[in-house]
């Protein structure tokens, strides 16, 4: 997606969203509402790698595909 990438980290069993720049307050709130938490270790917003996580990522980022 423009401004970042979605990573399926199978080693950590996490779906991670990595932004090129810090997301604004509204975007961070959307991530939190969709179950994502900030991971300083990976520098990514992440949640457990599931089918629902992929759906939530698209919803949080406003992606339709």
Residue ranges and their predicted role:
Residues 1-65:
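Accessory DNA-engaging acidic/polar modules
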């Amino acid at each position: 997606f423009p401004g970042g990438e979605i990573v399926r980290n199978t080693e950590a069993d996490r779906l991670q969203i990595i932004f090129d720049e810090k997301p604004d307050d509204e975007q961070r709130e959307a991530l939190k509402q969709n179950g994502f938490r900030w991971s300083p270790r990976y520098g990514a917003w992440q949640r457990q790698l599931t089918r629902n996580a992929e759906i939530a990522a698209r919803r949080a980022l406003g992606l339709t595909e």
